[in-house]
From Swiss-Prot:
The lineage of its organism: Bacteria, Bacillati, Bacillota, Bacilli, Lactobacillales. Its EC number is 6.1.1.17. This is Glutamate--tRNA ligase. Belongs to the class-I aminoacyl-tRNA synthetase family. Glutamate--tRNA ligase type 1 subfamily. It comes from Lactobacillus delbrueckii subsp. bulgaricus (strain ATCC BAA-365 / Lb-18). It catalyses: tRNA(Glu) + L-glutamate + ATP = L-glutamyl-tRNA(Glu) + AMP + diphosphate. It is found in: Cytoplasm.
């Protein structure tokens, strides 16, 4: 195996959108392939027809491309080892099913689900781990054939099970976990390799595919560790060499310390959800790659090229990776600060249009206004959808201050500062950020009020917020009429509250 060309695969099931955990698996395989100048194969594992979702494969492909992952072989681009959808490989699997049946390494099993469940219940009652018990124990070849013929005559459809040899140790050197081993009597007995509908099971099909596609390394989540001894059993039955395995640690929710579960609604877990919020693909690539893999040095922001250069599976963590939403927000903010402003404009415009704040086809003047709005908030946002809440003041009618804002203004010499600032603004013909800041300085000279006691009342009175972007830029975008209305309404409210 050491001399073979690196060939890895990402093999999702088309059961829904791209999950963070699956995206990490895809990224690690991508980086491993590119670092070693190897080949990445995309394979769609769609044999579980009951769970397949229409459009699921296309959704996976689209979101992988969005993340910046490409592959060398797959259902969309072809290759020398296809087909790349398991549903199109049934004849291939059948060939090896037949081989194992002929060699006596597999057999037809007619036990019904009801019989199997009754068997499991009995085992649980006895304190025994549920496992399949060979149904033809003590029978001759002729007796087995007769029993199977009788079952077929009753209309029963069989599964095919593979014989698990007794007293065998299945072991491998895992490139993440180290040496692992399982005894053959701990894996649940002879397991199904072909279902009643003729489709292969996962643990059989994956072995056939990985061998025929010459996969050299299998990097996947550690929830697959229990599958590995079953797959090694199939490799041995067919006389094939197994690939190198590496099982990545699970991802936990940093807030709860529990495994990241699709049922956990406290954190968004699908790539498409982050796309809708306006996260950048480069930021998602960066953040997800650091979930369970440590680069050299202290830096936390890397380009794709730097990741490819550094990636070494030996640096994959043996401890669970913590998914921290605040950390993801920070990473995305770092990328937004240097992102192409046209890209941010497109994302933020989509968010504003989804919220009904900007029309579908804005006029050039309105587009320029939106561009200025996005540029103003770019460094402040963790993701572009935040602009909907941050910029509400620009899309709403003048309103009264909140009780909290009134209490804040009470601390300062608010009224004289606001009144003088209103006078200074009234003189302006050109309502630009520079002129507005000049008006604030003039207010300072006229009133003697300075620092926070000057700026906070003016900010609250004009923008209805105690924090925000540059106050001059904000007021320029709001427009003089709106700002003057806010000032008038603020002074009226202060009078009503008896604040002079």
């Amino acid at each position: 195996m050491a001399n073979k060309k690196i060939r890895v695969r990402y093999a999702p099931s088309p059961t829904g959108h791209l999950h963070i955990g699956n995206a990490r698996t895809a990224l690690f395989n991508y980086l491993f392939a590119r670092h070693n100048k190897g080949t990445l194969v995309l394979r769609i594992e769609d044999t579980d027809t009951a769970r397949n979702v229409e459009g699921g494969a296309e959704s996976q492909i689209e979101n992988l491309h969005w993340l910046g992952i490409d592959w060398d072989e797959g259902p969309d681009i072809g290759g020398d080892y296809g087909p790349y959808k398991q549903s199109e490989r049934k004849d291939i699997y059948q060939k090896y099913i037949d081989q194992l049946l002929e060699e006596g390494k597999a057999y037809y099993s007619f036990k019904t689900e009801e019989e199997l469940e009754a068997q499991r219940e009995e085992q649980r009652a006895m304190g025994i781990a549920p496992h399949y018990v060979y149904e033809y124990e003590g029978m001759t070849t002729d007796e087995i054939k007769q029993a199977q013929d009788e079952a077929r005559a009753k209309g029963l459809k069989p599964v095919v099970r593979i014989h698990i040899p007794e007293g065998v140790t299945y072991e491998w050197d895992d490139i993440v976990k180290g040496h692992l081993s399982f005894e053959s009597d701990t894996i649940g007995g002879d397991f199904v390799i072909q279902k009643r509908d003729g489709m292969p099971t996962y643990n059989f099909a994956v072995v056939i595919d990985d061998h025929l596609m010459e996969i050299s390394h299998v990097l996947r989540g550690d929830d697959h560790i229990s599958n590995t001894p079953k797959q090694l059993c199939v490799y041995e039955a067919l006389g094939w060499e197994a690939p190198v395995f590496g099982h990545m640690t699970l991802i936990i929710n940093s807030a709860t310390g529990k495994k990241l579960s699709k049922r956990d609604e406290s954190v968004l877990q699908f790539i498409e959800q982050y796309r809708e919020l306006g996260f950048l693909p480069e930021a998602m690539f960066n953040f997800i790659t650091l979930l369970g893999w440590s680069p050299v040095g202290e830096s936390e922001i890397f380009s794709k090229r730097e990741f490819i250069k550094q990636f070494d599976p030996a640096r994959l963590s043996k401890s669970p990776a913590a998914f921290d939403q605040k950390k993801l927000d920070w990473v995305n903010n770092q990328y937004m600060k240097t992102a192409d402003r046209d890209e941010l404009l497109d994302l933020a415009l989509h968010n504003l249009q989804e919220a009904g704040l900007v029309e579908a086809n804005p006029a050039p003047g309105k587009m320029e206004w939106v561009r200025q709005l996005v540029n103003m908030y770019a460094n402040q946002m963790s993701y572009t959808k935040q602009i909907v809440d941050l910029s509400k003041i620009f899309f709403t009618e003048a309103k009264y201050l909140t009780d909290e804002e009134v209490e804040e203004i009470k601390k300062d010499e608010a009224r004289p500062a606001i009144e003088e600032f209103k006078k200074q603004l009234d003189k302006l013909d050109n309502f630009t950020a520079k002129k507005i800041m000049d008006a604030i300085m003039a207010t300072r000279r006229e009133t003697g009020i300075k620092g926070r006691k000057l700026f906070m009342p003016i900010r609250i009175a004009t923008t209805r917020s105690m924090v925000g972007p540059g106050i001059g830029e904000a007021m320029e975008l709001m427009g003089k009429d709106t700002v003057m209305k806010h000032l008038d309404l603020t002074l009226k409210q202060l009078s009503e509250a008896g604040i002079e």
